[in-house]
Amino acid sequence: MSFIEKLKNAWVSNNSLLCIGLDPDTEKFPDLFKTMAKPEAVFAFNKAIIDATHDLVCAYKPQIAYFSAEAAETSLEQTIAYIKTQYPHIPVILDAKRGDIGSTAQKYAAEAFERYQADAVTVNPYLGLDSITPFTAYRERGTILLCRTSNSGAADLQDLSVDGIPLYQKVAITARDHWNSHNNCLLVVGATWPEQMAAIRQLVGDMPFLVPGVGAQGGDVNAMVKAGKTADGNGLIISSSRAVLYASNGDDFAQAARAVALSLRQQINVARA
């Protein structure tokens, strides 16, 4: 089953557009993990979060830097393998934001799709087509291109005018017309920019969006969903990380994470009704 098919099924089966970002920061872990080696703690923490929320999400999104910074790449492999074994209907997005020349991009694609067995990966399109093709060549996997990101500095480059339109719109149009020949491209569009999201939706039709910026970054759920949803009420992978993962630093952290995830899913579903 392709990533896009898996995603569409998860939207329906879990009645959810919510994605939980797995950004394991060991300094924020509850005390019960403090006696473990960091890689062991990372996997144990992720496992508890996944077990508590698997029926509430349309995807999980591990951020690779949080694993590599702790020398916990093995924990990343374990985390993805656990999801695929226990909850195989839930797709996994590797948040790596890779971007390099073609030969190196081939290795980054192999890392994401062969080593880690991710269903999709985030990619920086700044280097153009030859840096993207090695990812989209994996036709059953998803390539998620940075378009209008959620951070405060996004406008520094993304709003620059290119051929009379903002650069982020140029990226969206180029993805639509030239990079999506296998229908496996998606776009990163931040929740913090609903007006820009609406403009991108008009440009790319039903192409799915990965939407960071909900929760700790302060994106407005109602405005974002109304701006970005497709005609069928889907089309979005709305990611929240810190607000869910660190809802509690006590032994009830997993239950607290579930409560926040349940609330977020409900907010999203009300907005898309």
Curated annotation (Swiss-Prot):
GO terms for molecular function: orotidine-5'-phosphate decarboxylase activity. It is an enzyme of class 4 (lyase). GO terms for biological process: 'de novo' pyrimidine nucleobase biosynthetic process; 'de novo' UMP biosynthetic process. Disulfide bonds: none annotated. Keywords: Decarboxylase, Lyase, Pyrimidine biosynthesis. InterPro entries: Aldolase_TIM, OMPdecase_AS, OMPdecase_type-2, OMPdeCOase_dom, RibuloseP-bd_barrel. Pathway: Pyrimidine metabolism; UMP biosynthesis via de novo pathway; UMP from orotate: step 2/2. Its EC number is 4.1.1.23. It catalyses: orotidine 5'-phosphate + H(+) = UMP + CO2. The active site is at K97. Belongs to the OMP decarboxylase family. Type 2 subfamily. This is Orotidine 5'-phosphate decarboxylase. It comes from Cellvibrio japonicus (strain Ueda107). The lineage of its organism: Bacteria, Pseudomonadati, Pseudomonadota, Gammaproteobacteria, Cellvibrionales.
